[in-house]
């Protein structure tokens, strides 16, 4: 939503709020003599999008209040009143009863104002020893920690779907490609497990990213810490943080943990985009390897015959959106002096959008993949084209004592002969093959078969059905 659209949408609400609230923000307006410009209120407000952080803001405030009581800055009664008030506010947020105010700018002041209205002046004590600067970055870390866990689970669900499909299609032969040209026969199950492995590394990156997310900045206050005798380790314990940020300037000013997540998300989307591209190609009439289900496709308003692969196309397109969010935040951060600057308000929308986009793409892929129809015969027949067993013939000659470079040359000539006579290598007679090298014997035809080519690659990580089955077995253990 543009700021101009926001202004038009909320102008009436803002005027109504202005009639029943003072014109200068009470949370910071002590040194101001003029009210904030009407448009600037909307231009500078973040409540349009940061209200998603409400549960985390309240979670952080409850932990902060508990710590304040334990160090003697709140009484037991004050702490209890604050926590009960915050719990009521959380309930209002969840049920939709909470009334968000643009004049209160952001999530923090909206919740604090409601708390003060509920419990009186005791609510004003909650902000002791903290700033919105360390409060917001704590909220983001709590939010992102949960989202990383959710995304990890979505990836593992997709991995399970891929492993199941790979197991069904272990013996399904398809052409493996380089430069989008048929190269060698592979198992379709092996191809699916390639994406399983990519996603496995994505999970590792998320796990590693989570370590740096899980560091608590609360207690950094505005930038220099606080004069109160707070116990940051206690607050970290209450919030489940593994460590605390050891430099208050760094704690409030950097967003590298968000950038790291966006980078990881971009890599995940890149993997999904590559997969999408292949599904789009395979479902085309030119390849005809798979049939996408009607429920994941749409048609054309003018061409009755069309069945468009919208879901993989959208995932491919949304990859650019996530890349853009990463670039956006890198650009926002690149020239900021320490510590906090208002620029950092722009960190949230790229983050929230990336989280929502990534989760949606993972979910739709996990739902779609099991419903795809595999056209095994078409895959097999396509593999028979393009001389995909040429390397096998070269390896055969090497095993007969010919140096590989010489074998490569011999097979190249035999392929040229096959092209001229419109025959695959497996369709050449023994006499025709022996014309290129006398060491070729009748056993070559097993080597030149697609099944023979597949079975010959029987080592760890290769495409033989036996190795694919072992890979799936190992992969399933990582999902437990």
Swiss-Prot record:
Which lineage? Answer: Bacteria, Pseudomonadati, Pseudomonadota, Gammaproteobacteria, Candidatus Pseudothioglobaceae
What EC number(s) does this enzyme carry? 4.3.2.1
Q: Which family does it belong to?
A: Belongs to the lyase 1 family. Argininosuccinate lyase subfamily.
| Pfam families from the UniProt entry | ASL_C2, Lyase_1
Localization per Swiss-Prot or TrEMBL: Cytoplasm
What HAMAP family has UniProt attached to this entry? Arg_succ_lyase
- Keywords annotated in UniProt: Amino-acid biosynthesis, Arginine biosynthesis, Cytoplasm, Lyase
- Identify the pathway: Amino-acid biosynthesis; L-arginine biosynthesis; L-arginine from L-ornithine and carbamoyl phosphate: step 3/3
Write down the top EC class of this protein: lyase
The protein here is known as Argininosuccinate lyase
Concerning InterPro entries, the annotation shows: Arg_succ_lyase_C (IPR029419), Argininosuccinate_lyase (IPR009049), Fumarase/histidase_N (IPR024083), Fumarate_lyase_CS (IPR020557), Fumarate_lyase_fam (IPR000362), Fumarate_lyase_N (IPR022761), L-Aspartase-like (IPR008948)
Instruction: Name the gene behind this protein.
Output: argH
Biological processes, Gene Ontology terms: arginine biosynthetic process via ornithine; L-arginine biosynthetic process
**Catalytic activity, as annotated:** 2-(N(omega)-L-arginino)succinate = fumarate + L-arginine
Please name the Gene3D superfamilies in this protein's record: Fumarase/aspartase (C-terminal domain) (1.10.40.30), Fumarase/aspartase (Central domain) (1.20.200.10), Fumarase/aspartase (N-terminal domain) (1.10.275.10)
Q: Which residues form a coiled coil?
A: none
Q: Which GO terms describe its cellular component?
A: cytosol
Q: For this protein, what is any one GO molecular function term?
A: argininosuccinate lyase activity
The lineage's top-level taxon is Bacteria
Has the keyword Ion transport been applied to this entry? no
């Amino acid at each position: 939503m543009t700021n101009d659209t926001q202004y038009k949408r909320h102008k009436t609400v803002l005027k109504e709020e202005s009639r029943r609230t003072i014109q200068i923000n009470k949370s910071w307006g002590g040194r101001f003599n003029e009210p904030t410009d009407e448009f600037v209120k909307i231009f500078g407000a973040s409540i349009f999008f940061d209200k998603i952080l409400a549960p985390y803001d309240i979670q952080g405030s409850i932990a902060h209040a508990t710590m304040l009581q334990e160090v003697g800055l709140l009484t037991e009664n004050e702490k209890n009143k604050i926590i009960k008030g915050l719990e009521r506010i959380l309930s209002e947020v969840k049920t939709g009863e909470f009334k968000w105010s643009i004049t209160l700018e952001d999530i923090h002041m909206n919740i604090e104002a409601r708390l003060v209205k509920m419990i009186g002046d005791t609510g004003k004590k909650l902000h002791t020893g903290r700033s919105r600067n360390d409060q917001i970055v704590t909220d983001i870390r709590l939010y992102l920690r949960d989202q990383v866990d959710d995304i990890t689970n979505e990836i593992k669900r997709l991995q399970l779907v891929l492993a199941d499909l790979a197991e069904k299609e272990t013996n399904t032969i398809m052409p493996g490609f380089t430069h989008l040209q048929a190269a060698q026969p592979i198992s379709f199950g092996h191809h699916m497990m390639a994406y399983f492995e990519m996603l496995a590394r994505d999970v590792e990156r998320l796990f590693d990213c989570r370590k740096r997310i899980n560091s608590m900045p609360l207690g950094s206050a505005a930038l220099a810490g606080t004069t109160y005798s707070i116990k940051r380790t206690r607050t970290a314990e209450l919030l489940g943080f593994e460590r605390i940020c050891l430099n208050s300037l760094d704690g409030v000013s950097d967003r590298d943990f968000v950038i790291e997540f966006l980078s990881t998300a971009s890599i995940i989307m890149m993997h999904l985009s590559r997969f999408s591209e292949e599904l789009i190609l395979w479902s085309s009439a030119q390849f005809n390897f798979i049939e996408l289900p009607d429920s994941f496709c749409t048609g054309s308003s003018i061409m009755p015959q069309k069945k468009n692969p919208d879901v993989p196309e959208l995932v491919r397109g949304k990859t650019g959106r996530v890349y853009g969010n990463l670039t956006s935040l890198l650009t926002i951060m690149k020239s900021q002096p320490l510590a906090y600057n208002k620029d950092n308000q722009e960190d949230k929308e790229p983050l929230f959008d990336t989280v929502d986009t990534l989760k949606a793409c993972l979910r739709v892929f996990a739902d779609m993949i099991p419903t795809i129809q595999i056209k095994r015969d078409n895959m097999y027949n396509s593999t028979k084209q393009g001389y995909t067993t040429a390397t096998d013939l070269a390896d055969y000659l090497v095993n007969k004592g010919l140096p590989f470079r010489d074998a490569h040359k011999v097979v190249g000539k035999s392929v040229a002969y096959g092209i001229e006579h419109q025959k695959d290598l497996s369709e050449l007679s023994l006499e025709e093959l022996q014309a290129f090298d006398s060491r070729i014997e009748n056993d070559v035809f097993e080597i030149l078969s697609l099944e023979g080519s597949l079975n010959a690659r029987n080592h760890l990580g290769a495409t033989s059905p036996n190795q694919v089955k072992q890979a799936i077995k190992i992969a399933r253990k990582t999902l437990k």
